[in-house]
Amino acid sequence: MNRLQLTASVVEREPVRYTPAGVPIASCTLQHRTEVVEAGIRRQVELTMPAVAAGEASGKLESCEMGVETLFTGFLAKKSRNARTLVFHITEMQGTGKD
């Protein structure tokens, strides 16, 4: 199963683009910060991740306020067929009420 849920905030956004079939694609960079316990040791986790949303989800991503924590759900895929870089493909999102 390839499913990812991440609480993050949008820190960069690109203009919406359209596929040849007319599907809107929104691209952004997400930032995530948290503290987790691994093997009994507290660990700070900070990361930025490229993300895209297609179709109806692109409109929702465009309306997300920059810097506001949001719960994103989706999957990971290669940026392109021959790339090693992963991109988070967002399919759902909901505000968490935290910022």
What are these regions (language model features)?
Residues 1-99:
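Single-stranded nucleic acid-binding surfaces, predominantly the OB-fold ssDNA-binding core
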